[in-house]
C-alpha cells in the first residue's frame, strides 16, 4: 500500500465480522478527499491475532512515514491495549456512542464479543442474509440470468460503474437479492434491453458515472487500453444513459457517492424496504 497525496492506509479491526467498522469507517472517510488503501481484519479475539495486525500497522508506518488510520471494535482489554500501542491513529467506532447511551440511561454496559451471538438466536435473519449473498454472487457481472423472478432488484450499467460493490453491500446489509448486468463495448453498436429483462422492468435500476471518473478507474486496471480511453468511456456512457431514458429506467450517478449512499438512494428511488437491518 503506497502513500501519496491522494491515498492513505486504513485498517478495520474487530473481534467480530468487522462490518460495523467498515461501514462507519466508510461514512467518515467519505468526508475527506483522499483514496483509502483498505485492509480488514475480522475475528481478532486473541493477543496472537492482534500481534499480526500490529505488525502490519508497523510495516505500513515504516514504509509510508505516516501513521495509518485504524477503525476498531475490540472488547477484550488485553487485545485492545496491544492494538492501541501500534503506531496509528486509532478510533473505537462504538466507544463514544456507548458512553452517551450509558450516561443517558444510567446503566453500565456489559460488553461481549460480537462473535458470541448465537446463529440459532437469529437463525431466520442469518440464513436470509446468507441466501441473499449467495444469490447475489451467483448473479454478479452477468454470470447468469436464470432465476430473475427471485431478484429484488436488477442493476444495469457499464463496466466499473459500481455495480458489484453496491450489489454485495445491499445483500450483506439489507438481505436483498441483487442481479447486476454489465453493458460491454460490443453492446454499444446495438444497444437494447435484453428480452430476459422485459418481464422484470419494475426491478431494473441503472448506475452511471462521469466519463472522467470512469476513465480514471479503468486506467488503474488497464492503463493505455482502448477500454480505458476517454473516448470509449464517453461513448459507452452516452449510449447506456440514452437506453435508460428511452426505456424509462431510473438511474443515478455514482461518481461522488459511497457504496452506502448509492444503496440507500436506490432503495429510496425504487420504493424498496430493507429486509434486514445491520
UniProtKB/Swiss-Prot annotation:
Major enzyme class: transferase
E.C. no: 2.7.11.33, 2.7.4.28
Keywords from the UniProt entry: Kinase, Nucleotide-binding, Serine/threonine-protein kinase, Transferase
One Pfam family named in its UniProt record: Kinase-PPPase
GO terms of molecular function: ADP binding; ATP binding; phosphotransferase activity, phosphate group as acceptor; protein serine/threonine kinase activity
Binding site for ADP: 157-164
Keyword Transferase: yes
Keyword Kinase: yes
InterPro entries the UniProt entry points to: Kinase-pyrophosphorylase, PSRP
Recorded superkingdom: Bacteria
Catalysed reaction equations from the record: [pyruvate, water dikinase] + ADP = [pyruvate, water dikinase]-phosphate + AMP + H(+); [pyruvate, water dikinase]-phosphate + phosphate + H(+) = [pyruvate, water dikinase] + diphosphate
Family (UniProt): Belongs to the pyruvate, phosphate/water dikinase regulatory protein family. PSRP subfamily.
HAMAP family: PSRP (MF_01062)
Role noted for this protein: Bifunctional serine/threonine kinase and phosphorylase involved in the regulation of the phosphoenolpyruvate synthase (PEPS) by catalyzing its phosphorylation/dephosphorylation.
Protein name: Putative phosphoenolpyruvate synthase regulatory protein
Organism: Vibrio parahaemolyticus serotype O3:K6 (strain RIMD 2210633)
Lineage: Bacteria, Pseudomonadati, Pseudomonadota, Gammaproteobacteria, Vibrionales
Amino acid at each position: 500500500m503506497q502513500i501519496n497525496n491522494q491515498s492513505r492506509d486504513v485498517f478495520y479491526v474487530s473481534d467480530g465480522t468487522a462490518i460495523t467498522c467498515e461501514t462507519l469507517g466508510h461514512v467518515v472517510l467519505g468526508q475527506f478527499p483522499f483514496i483509502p488503501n483498505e485492509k480488514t481484519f475480522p475475528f481478532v479475539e486473541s493477543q496472537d491475532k492482534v500481534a499480526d495486525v500490529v505488525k502490519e500497522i508497523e510495516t505500513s508506518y515504516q514504509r509510508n512515514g505516516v501513521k495509518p488510520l485504524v477503525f476498531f471494535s475490540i472488547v477484550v482489554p488485553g487485545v485492545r491495549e496491544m492494538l492501541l500501542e501500534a503506531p496509528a491513529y486509532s478510533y473505537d467506532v462504538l466507544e463514544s456512542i456507548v458512553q452517551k447511551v450509558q450516561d443517558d440511561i444510567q446503566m453500565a454496559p456489559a460488553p461481549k464479543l460480537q462473535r458470541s451471538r448465537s446463529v440459532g438466536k437469529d437463525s431466520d435473519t442469518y440464513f436470509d442474509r446468507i441466501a441473499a449473498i449467495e444469490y447475489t454472487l451467483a448473479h454478479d457481472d452477468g454470470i447468469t440470468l436464470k432465476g430473475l423472478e427471485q431478484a429484488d432488484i436488477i442493476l444495469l450499467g457499464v463496466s466499473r460503474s459500481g455495480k458489484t460493490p453496491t450489489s454485495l453491500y445491499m445483500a450483506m446489509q439489507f438481505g436483498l437479492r441483487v442481479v447486476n448486468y454489465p453493458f460491454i463495448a460490443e453492446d454499444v453498436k446495438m444497444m437494447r434491453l435484453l428480452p430476459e429483462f422485459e418481464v422484470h422492468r419494475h426491478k431494473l435500476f441503472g448506475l452511471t458515472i462521469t466519463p472522467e471518473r470512469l476513465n480514471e478507474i479503468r486506467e488503474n486496471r488497464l492503463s493505455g487500453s482502448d477500454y480505458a480511453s476517454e473516448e470509449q468511456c464517453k461513448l459507452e456512457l452516452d449510449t447506456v444513459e440514452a437506453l435508460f431514458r428511452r426505456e424509462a429506467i431510473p438511474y443515478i450517478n455514482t461518481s461522488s457517492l459511497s457504496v452506502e449512499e448509492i444503496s440507500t438512494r436506490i432503495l429510496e428511488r425504487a420504493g424498496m424496504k430493507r429486509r434486514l437491518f445491520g
